[in-house]
Amino acid sequence: MSILIDTLLDRVKKEFDKPPIQWENITPSKKDMNFLRQECNTESEFDKANKRKVMFDELIRGNLVMVTCKCNYGQVVAVFETMEQMAELPWDLWGRILRMFYEKRNKTLFKVFFLANKSLRVFPKGLKPIQTENINGGYTYRCNPETIVIYRAEDATRVLIHELQHSCCLDNIAHSLDVVEAETEAWAELFYIAILSQGNTRIFNNLLQKQSEWMIKQNRKVKKHMTNSESTEFPWRYTVGKEKIWNEWGILNKSITPGDNVVRSLRLTYPPNNTLKERFKVIKESTIL
């Protein structure tokens, strides 16, 4: 795995040696608006509270802000609750992520439909089972780069990476859905800390330690909400399952410090500090990074 990590960091470093991504404001097409309307008005097992519909309805009433931007690798149709929230999105970083997944031979640009709902990922009260509304925040249609839907602001950068893998046909369909999701999430979180490190080994190792500790402490709590902590019941695929894979890869840092920094959070990545937020040009209130 060390060879793969070295390769990943080298790839990320080369990405940040390239010029910044140039975004331009555009008007969303009728096709894109119809897709967004259809998705927001369709029930989904991942969004049982239908946060998508609530936000779309508020958008139509004129109470929310829509921004559509395009670069050479894709476009983002973003719906924000406030104008100030626009400064929470790391535009250059998202563009670089799209560029790293983009395949020239395919020539299909990514389309990301981002509904920046501010609701946070939190554990349910007591020891109630964890449901999709506690933890999920996006989906896509497999092998379709034009259908990435993210409907929660918190941890949206990690969700973008997760869904890009599905959209690029990287799923091992020989595996069960739970295992595919666990593998995808394991890779998403590894890629996330790699790109935040900008390919710097020292920063990467520090983030790897923080992410490992966050994962382990969070999953100790997750198991208490499961009927059988050794099973693959929900949300094993996003939590215990991905930790198992990191452990198998030999990258899980098991050095745990005292204290509970997770508290009630079900955000899957360790929250970035203000230094990282400044580096990626987002305001300190940003949960999107």
Across the structure, where does each feature detected by a protein language model lie?
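Amphipathic alpha-helical segments that form well-ordered structural scaffolds
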Residues: L93-M100, W187-A194, E248-I251
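Pan-zinc metallopeptidase signature
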Residues: E213-L289
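Auxiliary, metal-adjacent structural segments of Zn-dependent hydrolase domains
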Residues: N41-E146, I150-E154, Q198-G199
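Active-site recognition of the HExxH zinc-binding catalytic motif
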Residues: R158-D171, A188
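Post-HExxH zinc-binding segment in Zn-dependent metallohydrolases
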Residues: N172-V222
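Intrinsic disorder
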Residues: E88, D155, D178-A182
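Short, polar loop/linker segments at the starts of domains and inter-domain junctions
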Residues: P19-S29, L89, K128, S229-P235
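Short Lys/Arg-enriched alpha/beta "domain-start" segment
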Residues: S2-L59, L64
